[in-house]
Amino acid sequence: MENKTPEKSNGNNAEFLRIENITKSWDAVTAVDRVSLTIAKGELFALLGSSGCGKSTLLRMLAGFETPTSGKIFLDGKDITDVPPYERPINMMFQSYALFPHMSVWENIAFGLKRDGMPKDQIESRVENMLQLVQLKPYAKRKPHQLSGGQQQRVALARCMAKRPQLVLLDEPLGALDKKLREQTQLEVVNILEQVGLTCVMVTHDQQEAMTMSSRIAVMSEGKFLQIGSPSEIYETPNCRFVADFIGDCNMFNGSLIVDEPDHVVAETPECKHYVGHGITGTLGMDVSVAVRPEKIVVTKTKPESEFNSCQGEVVDLAYLGSYTTYHLKLKSGMKLKASAPNIDRHHEGAPTWGDKVFASWSESAMVVLTS
């Protein structure tokens, strides 16, 4: 998974949404556990985690559908913790889209504006503007069942934005779409939100979706934030084993620290010695994990010269995936190692194949040492 470069801006960096020590508990179950967060105006922020991690509960508290057990929520400097949903300048778009099947696209977008008593001429102008923004003007008279999944998603987004809320909440916004359409729609949604300049918080369990769409990500587990950062920070420098393993594919070598210098460390695992080109906060002999992404590993039939950062194994499986090939190696220690290589040439003569004895190696900057 690769994020677009350069990375998306964090809005204008002015604090807009602030969450202070929010907790939500039901009897003995704590769904959200003392989380704090600030989000800038115009930022697209993702809450990422597996089912049951607390991300949707947090989103519902932002919307006002759930009341925090403790903590505060501030929007544009105002305490909205106890403000009911219908009085919050916030709109939420659900995974199901919740479009009215008996209404046309135009009528769906206009619905909230009519409920608010907006003058007819202003409604017409606003709806036309939204239709143009989401590129659905030719479909204004169609009913939802006459649209594709991606078009329905854009109608729901237009309806969500039509009232010009201060904050937009997206709950698994693209979960109902197939993979190819989902990937295409991700960038469309980002472009629309950026054009309008809205601040957005989205919930997803899809790592690629979070990394493609958001400027920053909070990885959640058991009601807590484990790491908050840009997509590249989360992917390249995870701060714990869970984040490294949850975001993308990762090979985890478990061992102990045998050299601890300010500019480098050496960790020893059953597979090999790892020379890591940066220091860590730790002590000799402590248990560590060395994380290496598959795409940072080079697979060759010849043994590397260095005594560090390489190990021997056998190709037990491989998967040709078009743009790259993934090798599954069984190392002497019994560990299964995953390595990915780009398919630069159409036919790569001499490339490793099933049953080959090979060497896997990686650079000193390809690793992250994890202590928790």
Where are these regions (language model features)?
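Short coil-to-beta microelement around the adenine-binding A-loop and adjacent beta1/P-loop entry
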Residues: W26-T30
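ABC ATPase nucleotide-binding domains
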Residues: L44, P85-D245
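Non-catalytic connector elements of ABC transporters
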Residues: K4, C250, V259-S372
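Helix-to-loop junction immediately C-terminal to a conserved catalytic motif
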Residues: A63
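Conserved ABC transporter NBD signature motif
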Residues: G71-D79
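The feature captures the beta-strand-to-loop junction immediately N-terminal to the Walker
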Residues: L48-S50
